[in-house]
Design a protein with these regions (language model features):
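Alpha-helical architecture
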Residues: 81, 112-113
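Conserved SAM-binding loop
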Residues: 113-119
């Protein structure tokens, strides 16, 4: 039980850290937060090996400049809302089963996947990473996925002890985090398959973030002259920016 509580607390802390900067940025305490948190970001930026962690890989204060990037931004909101809604539905199902003492939740999404609540939180985490796109958030998301896997394993051990008549058979017919057919195809049930799946997920997350940053940078409507670089908040203001910047630079 202590191990379960530790894993659960770790997952909660990771999700809280991911959400924290977003919540504070829309609050009146943004200045205070950055005065306290800025040394951490500066510490990361101090060394070439960790500098990338504090940087952004997608627009967050600017309107995305093209339809593809706008679609990515919208999908961030969709994934976050969808993940949280599915999580709440799954949580309601689990607690209803406990309240009415009907045994483990085996219907709905649980009839295909044993831990849809963790999968839905991971999906919501992808949405959060798009809405507040620091590389550090991506690394925290990868860590969170690993903690969810440990939670799922610990939960299954406890459920097999509590429901030895139904849960072992349930495990044979369902997947842990993906439909059983998918997990069988990637050999997820083996230790090597799990390790390979985690490495692939981590590589896709970090590599995808770098690719998105490269694409975003190459499509930003940048105005530059000498050592001055400017960006319009709204892409439609690029013409005004080009027209006015020459006059602005003449102001003493």
């Amino acid at each position: 039980m202590n191990k379960s509580r530790t894993l659960l607390n770790s997952a909660i802390v990771l999700y809280f850290v991911i959400c924290l900067e977003i919540l504070i940025m829309i609050s009146p305490f943004a200045g205070f937060f950055y005065s306290a948190f800025n040394p951490v970001l500066l510490g990361l930026a101090k060394y070439p090996e960790t500098r990338w962690l504090s940087s952004f890989f997608f627009t967050h204060l600017l309107v995305p400049p093209n339809d593809f990037l706008k679609f990515i931004r919208i999908m961030g909101s969709v994934l976050f809302v969808l993940g949280m809604v599915v999580f709440l539905i799954c949580a309601l199902q689990v607690y209803a089963s406990k309240f009415f003492k009907t045994g483990p939740a085996l219907k709905g999404l649980y009839s295909r996947i044993r831990h849809p609540q963790y999968l839905s939180l991971a999906v919501a985490g992808i949405g959060l990473a798009i809405l507040w796109p620091r590389f550090l958030v991506v690394i925290l998301w990868i860590s969170m996925v690993f903690v969810y896997y440990l939670l799922a394993r610990d939960e299954e051990r406890r459920m097999q002890k509590q429901h030895p008549e139904t849960y072992p058979e349930y495990i044979k017919t369902t997947g842990m985090l993906l439909p059983k057919r998918v997990e069988d195809a990637i050999h997820f049930s083996t230790g090597g398959g799990k390790a390979a799946a985690f490495i692939v997920v981590a590589a896709l997350a970090v590599g995808g973030a770098f690719l998105l940053r490269d694409y975003t940078v190459h499509h930003l409507p940048v105005w530059a002259e000498s050592n001055i670089v400017a960006l319009p908040i709204v892409p439609g203001d690029q013409g005004m920016l080009e027209f006015r910047m020459a006059d602005i630079l003449q102001v003493p």
